Amino acid sequence: MDIIYISTPHNTHIQYLRKALAAGKHVLCEKSITLNSEELAEAIKLAEENHVKLAEAMTIFHMPIYRKLSEIVASGKLGPLKVIQMNFGSYKEYDMTNRFFNRNLAGGALLDIGVYALSFVRWFMTSQPTEMVSQVKLAPTGVDEQAGILLTNREGEMATV
């Protein structure tokens, strides 16, 4: 076995990443690769120490529409981007037993689909955001049910999600 694909619920990723990377296996892990930056730093360090590759599976970048958008932006036909707006959503019937509404199972809109929207705008921004402001609406279980995010960078680009 050369590579391990992790597609379990988000809250279990780090435990499987630790085992796979420590065993010297390359890993492709579904989004969100980890729950926070500390876990991600740990996973990256393990990959480096064991000389293996670690990658996050993000389907949107392989969809034809995203590839076409990338081509158009890269061509310069639109000029420099100043504002990027991304709306991404899904409807889930509220059910406090569903993993999407369960804090212990890393539920919430941002970890489930918000990563797609944030990855999209980051793909097109020239540099890392220097400022990020957000507002969320919490479900009764405490997970984020809705979110709005504003990102800006040193080039003056702005993105809304």
Across the structure, where does each feature detected by a protein language model lie?
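Beta-loop-alpha module in the N-terminal Rossmann-like domain of NAD(P)-dependent dehydrogenases
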Residues: 1-46
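Alpha-helical elements of Rossmann-like donor-binding domains used by nucleotide-donor carbohydrate transfer enzymes
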Residues: 3, 15, 42, 64, ...
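Structured beta->alpha junctions
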Residues: 9, 32, 39, 58-61, ...
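A short helix->loop->beta-strand "cap" motif at the edges of active sites that frequently abuts
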Residues: 23-25, 50-53, 156-158
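Rossmann-fold dehydrogenase core element
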Residues: 41-59, 80-84
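Predominantly a Rossmann-like dinucleotide-binding segment in NAD(P)-dependent oxidoreductases
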Residues: 60-132, 140
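Contiguous beta-strand/loop segments that form the cofactor/metal-binding neighborhood of enzyme cores
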Residues: 119-161
